[in-house]
Structures are given as structure tokens and as C-alpha cells.
């Protein structure tokens, strides 16, 4: 692991662990069909078996938007050229942060599983997201994100 890589756990004062030495970011891509791209997380991953956004650890000096777009490209084949950032939402715990980047995709595309972190990738209609077993932190954030779409 290079010194610039953020791939490491951060432990909070209460013992809770968070992925990303420099924080983390995820991309919530929104299709022209009003669907969001979700990732079914591999069983071995943190909160495995749940659905959430492609995302991961930020690198040192990397912006949250750049990290979210990079992670989505790595994990789901999301083409950055099709994205227009709509807004960001930040959970800042003081010692660790997670930024959700919400971006419109100018056209529908087929996501591609390109690493072992995903069991499946799926465009999910916004009104059906709650039907899935969601990553607990995404489940907490989803109502506010949905209302802003």
C-alpha cells in the first residue's frame, strides 16, 4: 500500500471502525429513467450482502468527488464522461467523513462488475430502493437523498 492510499481502517472513540484513512466517498448515479445504480456487496466485505453505492476510501489529497468517481469506475465501470454532479452530502464525524456524490448520468449505461467487491450491480427505480436490504449507513441516508433527487 502506498503512503498516498487511504486503504485502511479508522477507529472512532467508541471503537467503531470506518474504512478510509482520509475518509471515504461513494457515487449515487441517477439515470435518465430515474433509477439509481446500486451495488450488492460481496459477503466478505463490510456489511456484506447489503446494497449500497459504489464507493470507497479516498486517497491522500484526493477530492471526495474525484474519489467517488474513481471508485465507481473501478467497481462498476461507471463512465465519468457521462456524469454531471448534482450535489454532495457529507457525514462528518470529526475524525472521519463520508461524502455521497449524487450525479446525473446523461444516458443509461450497463454497469460492469470489475472487481470482487460486488455480487451484482443494478439500476433500481428510486421508488423500489427501500425493497432491498440496504447497507445500514446508506439506509440512514437514503430518505434525505431520495427527497433531494
Give the location of each predicted region:
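Conserved Nudix-box catalytic region and its N-terminal flanking loop in Nudix hydrolases
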Residues: 31-74
Amino acid at each position: 500500500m502506498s503512503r498516498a492510499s487511504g486503504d485502511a481502517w479508522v477507529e472512532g472513540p467508541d471503537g467503531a471502525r470506518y474504512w478510509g484513512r482520509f475518509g471515504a466517498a461513494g457515487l449515487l448515479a441517477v439515470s435518465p429513467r430515474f433509477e439509481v445504480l446500486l451495488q450488492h456487496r460481496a459477503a466478505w466485505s463490510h456489511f456484506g450482502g447489503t446494497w449500497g453505492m459504489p464507493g470507497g476510501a479516498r486517497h491522500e489529497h484526493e477530492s471526495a468527488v474525484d474519489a467517488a468517481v474513481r471508485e465507481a469506475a473501478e467497481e462498476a465501470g461507471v463512465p465519468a464522461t457521462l456524469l454531471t454532479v448534482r450535489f454532495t452530502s457529507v457525514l462528518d464525524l470529526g475524525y472521519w467523513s463520508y461524502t455521497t456524490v449524487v450525479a446525473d448520468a446523461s444516458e443509461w449505461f450497463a454497469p460492469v462488475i470489475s472487481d470482487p467487491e460486488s455480487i451484482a450491480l443494478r439500476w433500481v427505480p428510486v421508488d423500489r430502493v427501500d425493497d432491498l436490504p440496504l447497507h445500514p449507513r446508506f439506509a440512514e441516508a437514503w430518505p434525505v437523498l431520495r427527497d433531494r433527487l
